[in-house]
Design a protein with these regions (language model features):
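Short hydrophobic beta-strand segments
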Residues: 1-6, 87-90, 142
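Catalytic metal-binding/acid-base residues of hydrolase active sites
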Residues: 72, 96-98, 146, 186-188, ...
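Catalytic cores of soluble, metal-dependent hydrolases
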Residues: 2-65, 76-77, 83, 151-258
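Short active-site oxyanion
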Residues: 62-64, 137-141
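Active-site histidine-anchored catalytic micro-motif
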Residues: 63-131, 220
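Active-site glycine-rich loop that binds ribose-phosphate moieties when present
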Residues: 109-135, 143-150, 159-168
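Cofactor-binding loop segments of dinucleotide-utilizing enzymes, especially the Rossmann-like FAD-
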Residues: 6-8, 93-95, 120, 145, ...
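Active-site flanking residues adjacent to catalytic metal/cofactor-binding acidic residues
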Residues: 69, 93-95, 143, 181-185
Length: 258
């Protein structure tokens, strides 16, 4: 596997994201000049660079693993997989739906629209800049998403996107074909991972998350992983919780590569 560290939250570079990456894993840290005049052009520049890196990694016969500060980077990753000739399905593990739109969002937070953008909403903003083809809704599995806003629930009720609880995730529930796994660590209960940007109560524990992640790994169909470390920058990890999570997930990945 090839680890690409993308310490960005949307178009904001976060050198103090403080992700405890293992010292025995080669890591390429990502830093891009984003001189664009607006957020859309800056996101397009960033995700085009991510897409190019993912494409190179796949063509070299290596699994791309992105460690980032948000879920929107998965848009660039999907474009990169497509450029490399893959047609990925999406498994999106998150406490939230990430299915808001500019018209429905109460906060204006673009990270809360990440999956909706990936699925083809307003392609003029980001997708068209990447030549991204939206995945079919029927090949998208949204896992957990316990904190949904009403417009997101309405969208899901009429869409082809499948849903699963974290504990209910099995090989049979996975969509077909190669899989891009977007794993937002805010799916955990906030008591398990302090300092999250958008904590959502009543979430699963670490053991349940690792079990669900292994369901995807054990399928043998993982094409790429975005490990979204969605905590506030500048925070330390005094109890070693982040280190345990990141180290364990990457160790599981390496074990599957042997």
């Amino acid at each position: 596997m090839s680890v690409l560290y993308v310490p960005y939250h949307l178009d904001e570079h976060q050198p103090d994201l403080n992700v405890p990456l293992p010292g025995d894993v080669p890591v390429a840290e990502f830093a891009v000049e984003l001189p664009g005049p607006d957020v859309w052009s800056r996101l397009g520049q960033l995700y085009d660079a991510v897409a190019a890196a993912v494409e190179r990694t796949v063509r070299a016969g290596t699994l791309p693993v992105v460690v980032s500060g948000d879920c929107t980077v998965s848009i660039g990753m999907t474009a990169g997989l497509q450029r490399a000739g893959l047609d990925p399905s999406i498994v999106w593990i998150d406490a939230h739906g990430d299915l808001q739109t500019l018209e429905t969002t109460p906060s204006g937070y673009l990270g809360g629209m990440a999956l909706r953008f990936l699925l083809g909403y307003r392609p003029d903003h980001v997708a068209d800049r990447l030549a991204l083809r939206p995945p079919a809704e029927e090949r998208v599995l949204l896992v957990d998403a316990r904190d949904l806003d009403p417009p997101e629930a309405d969208y899901l009720a009429s869409s082809g996107v499948s849903r699963s609880g974290l504990d209910a995730l099995t090989p049979e529930t996975l969509p077909p074909g190669p899989i891009l796994l977007n794993l937002d660590l805010d799916v955990l209960d906030p008591s398990c991972l302090p300092g999250l940007r958008y904590p959502a109560a009543d979430g699963p524990g670490v053991a349940a998350l690792l079990r669900a992640t292994r369901v995807v790994l054990d399928s043998g169909r993982l094409a790429a992983l975005n490990l979204a470390c969605t905590w506030h920058p500048g925070r330390t990890d005094p109890d070693g919780i982040r280190e345990h999570l990141v180290t364990t997930i990457l160790a599981d990945l390496r074990a599957k590569q042997v």
